[in-house]
């Protein structure tokens, strides 16, 4: 029986693709295990949503693009992570490693290479991340969500496969969503998602605009961990720090979304044909990958986008109103999108690429 080791973590985006693939792997008769960090969000997500999967925690550092004394310390963490991962891989003897990226994945990919275990990497963003750039040197193949990403990668190693969406995404129950929120079925619902880490600026502007927003929408506000404001209580407004199992039910009642521009999230909104106003992480907080993702979706006519540096209460309301006027056009553009690979076909390709 073919055994696949999965790795990736640090943010929800580096875990959600694996969460969508592992159930398909199990249903097709593959064995699966997960290697991640000791305290990262991937451990919480995998152990809560896939308790049947063995989770192996390893030491991991952080990949920084700036000079810091912490970089020296993290060299030793990465080296220990390689040793930790080698120990796991020698014990489990997987046939291949599937890496979703994030800083925890690098020592695992290096360890796999040292044991002659073939690695397939997945890159969700339009431009490759630092972890995947490093890991690619030790990998057999890299799969991309955006076709344009192939321009940044060696032709002999890169293949475009499109987005990988979790199976339960379309199974959200609107009735459950309305019961969960207590919302009125006859009024539009706006979902605000600031990413797994949240956005203090976006949260502040939403709360500042709440009275105006509530005239047109009921608002579900995913604030990010530790950013919920218990003092803000209004009819038609509900806050969560983070939603796991109930997210599909909330998406089932969502008419419009304001969101960061992580690739996995925006492809889920695209699949569900939910018009989106994207506020990507700025260059002061990231390498600009979300800006590229957002601009690509805007160019395709799937979304509107606002730079966080330009985000004000007035601009937010203005862009939302314009998007509502273009709602039909945006949804029609979304209907032209087609998924490139089924998960079953993707696993067939993965096995062929890794083991041949």
Curated annotation (Swiss-Prot):
Keywords, alphabetical: Cell cycle, Cell division, Cell membrane, Cell shape, Cell wall biogenesis/degradation, Glycosyltransferase, Membrane, Peptidoglycan synthesis, Transferase
Membrane topology: Peripheral membrane protein
Binding site for UDP-N-acetyl-alpha-D-glucosamine: 166, 196, 290
Stretches assigned to coiled coil: none
UniProt-annotated location(s): Cell membrane
GO MF annotation: an example: undecaprenyldiphospho-muramoylpentapeptide beta-N-acetylglucosaminyltransferase activity
GO BP term (any one): regulation of cell shape
Pathway(s) it belongs to: Cell wall biogenesis; peptidoglycan biosynthesis
Residues making up the signal peptide according to the UniProt record: none
Top-level taxon of the source organism: Bacteria
PANTHER family documented for this protein: UDP-N-ACETYLGLUCOSAMINE--N-ACETYLMURAMYL-(PENTAPEPTIDE) PYROPHOSPHORYL-UNDECAPRENOL N-ACETYLGLUCOSAMINE TRANSFERASE, UDP-N-ACETYLGLUCOSAMINE--N-ACETYLMURAMYL-(PENTAPEPTIDE) PYROPHOSPHORYL-UNDECAPRENOL N-ACETYLGLUCOSAMINE TRANSFERASE 1
Name assigned to this protein: UDP-N-acetylglucosamine--N-acetylmuramyl-(pentapeptide) pyrophosphoryl-undecaprenol N-acetylglucosamine transferase
The gene coding this protein: murG
């Amino acid at each position: 029986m073919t055994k696949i080791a999965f790795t990736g973590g640090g943010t929800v985006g580096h875990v959600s693709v694996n969460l969508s693939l592992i159930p398909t792997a199990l249903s097709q008769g593959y064995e699966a295990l997960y290697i991640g960090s000791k305290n990262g969000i991937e451990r919480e997500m995998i152990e809560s949503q896939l308790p049947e999967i063995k989770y192996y925690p390893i030491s991991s550092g952080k990949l920084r693009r700036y000079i810091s004394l912490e970089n020296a310390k993290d060299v030793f963490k990465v080296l220990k992570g390689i040793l930790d991962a080698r120990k796991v891989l020698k014990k489990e003897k997987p046939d291949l490693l599937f890496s979703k990226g994030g800083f925890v994945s690098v020592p695992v990919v290096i360890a796999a290479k040292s044991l002659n275990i073939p690695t397939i990497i997945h890159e969700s963003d339009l431009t490759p991340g630092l972890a995947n750039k490093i890991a690619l040197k030790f990998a057999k193949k890299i799969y991309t969500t955006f076709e344009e990403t192939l321009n940044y990668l060696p032709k002999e190693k890169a293949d475009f496969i499109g987005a990988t969406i979790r199976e339960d995404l379309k199974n959200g129950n609107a009735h459950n969503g309305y019961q969960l929120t207590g919302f009125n079925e006859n009024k539009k619902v706006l979902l605000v998602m600031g990413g797994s880490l949240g956005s203090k600026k976006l949260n502040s502007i939403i709360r500042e605009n709440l009275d105006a927003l509530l005239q047109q929408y009921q608002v579900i506000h995913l604030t990010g961990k530790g950013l919920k404001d218990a003092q803000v209580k209004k009819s038609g407004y509900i806050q969560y720090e983070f939603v796991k199992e109930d997210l599909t039910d909330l998406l089932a009642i969502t008419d419009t979304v304001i969101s960061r521009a992580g690739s996995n999230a925006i492809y889920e909104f695209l699949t569900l044909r939910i018009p989106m106003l994207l506020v990507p992480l700025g260059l002061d907080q990231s390498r600009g990958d979300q800006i590229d993702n957002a601009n690509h979706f805007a160019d395709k006519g799937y979304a509107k986008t606002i730079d966080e540096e330009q985000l004000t209460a007035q601009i937010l309301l203005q862009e939302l109103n314009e998007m509502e006027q273009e709602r039909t056009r945006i949804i029609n553009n979304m209907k032209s999108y087609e998924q490139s690979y089924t998960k079953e076909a993707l696993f067939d390709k993965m096995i062929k690429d890794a083991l041949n």
